[in-house]
Amino acid sequence: MKKDYYEILGLSKGASKDEIKKAYRKIAIKYHPDRNQGNEEAASIFKEATQAYEVLIDDNKKAKYDRFGHSAFEGGGFEGFSGGFSGFSDIFEDFGDIFDSFFTGNKGQERNRKHARGEDLGYNIEISLENAYFGYKNNINITRQILCHSCLGKKSEKGTSPSICNMCNGSGRVVQGGGFFRVTTTCSKCYGEGKTISNPCKSCKGKGRITNQETIQLNIPSGIDNNQQIKMKGKGNVNPDNQEYGDLYVKILIRSHKIFKRNGKDLYAMLPISFTQAALGKEVRIKTIASKEIKIQIPKGIENEEQIIVKGAGMPILQTEKFGNLILITKIKTPKNLNSNAIKLFENLSKELRDGDEIDLLKV
């Protein structure tokens, strides 16, 4: 018994054309033979979906099917269709973006591969916050694929030439299947090149490129942030087909600092101050990330975890002459291990301030 066409596409009767197209598109992408080579079950599902789509997308055929079911097409050429299967290729006109690569043997992919640059490479380097502040120069060692010095990317030994592929006769593509169900794919022997290397270059083993280890200088600019990347043009792998090199992307990882915490252009640090400094205020000296000594004023009566902003003492802003701020967060230290004189002073201060033994929690 033949399956219901709506059921094959996962639709209910009365589905719109857009719904039919979307349902077929989803199945076709998943089960197309070019993506499931050698998988007979996938080919069968794709064939069923195509038959269902061919009927349900056509208003006349759909009307007949809705009224009479499969019997409306008994005796026809395509699985019993009265109209035959004259327009198989027309089915895919609305899906050119998907099926162009399937039905042209991935010509677009072959063309892109031959004209694309070589692969990009990635490299991670860890630096200190001071390195990020001042900028940093360092040599890094990389391994990449460069053009073979012997064959210059031609892949054959000197004095020899590639041979025409005998599987695809130089087209780079082969046709699979028969009758209406034919799919063109990339030749598995020459990988779409249309030619094979009968006498491969001994230096690169017919690949057209060789592995090379080299040392290059990396210039890290002042103000760079964590996880930012530096692009080094042409320092990736080579594509031997066109001798174009990819790029190297160096990712910057900044180590945590024991004093300063970074947030973009600004730096944060704890500022430990005494009880008296907090109460009376005081001018103090501190060192910045640049090891520069500066003076700051602690305001009278400052509370714990309040901020003091030092403008221009933060990180350099990348590719500018501007700087962020240094934000100091106060941490008031409670005195411990007091001697007798200090104890008397605090007792007198407590009396002067009229510290009682009752605390109102609402006055925090």
UniProtKB/Swiss-Prot annotation:
Binding site for Zn(2+) 2: C165, C168, C187, C190
CXXCXGXG motif repeats: 148-155, 165-172, 187-194, 201-208
Gene3D superfamilies with a match to the protein in the record: DnaJ domain, Heat shock protein DnaJ, cysteine-rich domain, Urease metallochaperone UreE, N-terminal domain
PROSITE patterns with a match to the protein in the record: DNAJ_1 (PS00636), DNAJ_2 (PS50076), ZF_CR (PS51188)
Binding site for Zn(2+) 1: C148, C151, C201, C204
Zn finger region (CR-type): 135-213
Domain of life where this protein originates: Bacteria
Tagged with keyword ATP-binding: no
Signal sequence bounds: none
Record note on cofactor: Binds 2 Zn(2+) ions per monomer.
Location of this chain's protein in the cell: Cytoplasm
Residue ranges of every copy of the J domain listed in the record: 4-69
Pfam families, sorted: DnaJ, DnaJ_C, DnaJ_CXXCXGXG
Chaperone found in the keyword field: yes
Molecular function GO labels: ATP binding; heat shock protein binding; unfolded protein binding; zinc ion binding
Alphabetic keyword roster: Chaperone, Cytoplasm, DNA replication, Metal-binding, Repeat, Stress response, Zinc, Zinc-finger
Example of a GO cellular component annotation carried by this entry: cytoplasm
InterPro entries per record: DnaJ, DnaJ_C, DnaJ_domain, DnaJ_domain_CS, HSP40/DnaJ_pept-bd, HSP_DnaJ_Cys-rich_dom, HSP_DnaJ_Cys-rich_dom_sf, J_dom_sf
Cofactor(s) annotated in UniProt: Zn(2+)
Chief site of localization: cytoplasm
GO biological process, one term: protein refolding
Function: Participates actively in the response to hyperosmotic and heat shock by preventing the aggregation of stress-denatured proteins and by disaggregating proteins, also in an autonomous, DnaK-independent fashion. Unfolded proteins bind initially to DnaJ; upon interaction with the DnaJ-bound protein, DnaK hydrolyzes its bound ATP, resulting in the formation of a stable complex. GrpE releases ADP from DnaK; ATP binding to DnaK triggers the release of the substrate protein, thus completing the reaction cycle.
Annotated domain remarks: The J domain is necessary and sufficient to stimulate DnaK ATPase activity. Zinc center 1 plays an important role in the autonomous, DnaK-independent chaperone activity of DnaJ. Zinc center 2 is essential for interaction with DnaK and for DnaJ activity.
Family the entry assigns: Belongs to the DnaJ family.
Record's protein name: Chaperone protein DnaJ
Species assigned in the record: Borrelia garinii subsp. bavariensis (strain ATCC BAA-2496 / DSM 23469 / PBi) (Borreliella bavariensis)
